[in-house]
């Protein structure tokens, strides 16, 4: 009889534990843009899931003069550009972020939306971030689009943000 009760309690505990961890956290509000892939809404630190933007102080290169087979490149602050483009996109509007987990820095890993627009997708598709393939395959097509069309960081050379 005690063994039966033990298993019932164990099963209830397991069900309760997994239910607690399966619900998504939803954050809604006007965010503070921390950098090209991080936001803060009401003191909740949010990391945009599945993407990696250049770091704030990261420098990239883009062509400024092409003569026949020669290409001259100039440096630019691609990390600051990614941050500013995210600020410009959000433009003090309400954002909704849906998170199912946290990263090692205790930030919510989230897909964020401006109305119905996936912000994470927009950043990758326009070349302000790369698909973070180590953690997700979700934004690979958007990255291929940006690369093919030489948008954002794909117009020149850059060090992958993960390696910077």
Please provide the spans of the model-predicted regions.
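Small beta-barrel nucleic-acid-binding modules, primarily SNase/OB-fold domains
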Residues: 2-164
């Amino acid at each position: 009889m005690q063994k039966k009760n033990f298993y019932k309690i164990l099963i209830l505990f397991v069900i309760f534990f997994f239910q607690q961890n399966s619900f998504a956290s939803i954050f809604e509000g006007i965010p503070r843009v921390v950098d090209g892939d991080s936001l803060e809404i009401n003191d909740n630190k949010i990391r945009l899931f599945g993407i990696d933007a250049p770091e704030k102080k990261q420098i990239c290169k883009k062509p400024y003069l092409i003569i026949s087979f020669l290409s001259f490149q100039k440096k630019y602050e691609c990390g600051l550009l990614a941050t500013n483009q995210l600020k410009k996109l959000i433009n003090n509007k309400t954002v909704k972020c849906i998170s199912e987990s946290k990263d090692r820095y205790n930030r919510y890993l989230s897909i964020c939306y401006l109305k119905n627009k996936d912000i994470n997708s927009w950043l990758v598709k326009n070349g302000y971030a790369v698909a973070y393939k180590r953690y997700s395959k979700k934004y690979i097509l958007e990255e291929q689009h940006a690369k093919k069309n030489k948008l954002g960081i794909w117009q020149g050379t850059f060090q992958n943000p993960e390696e910077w």
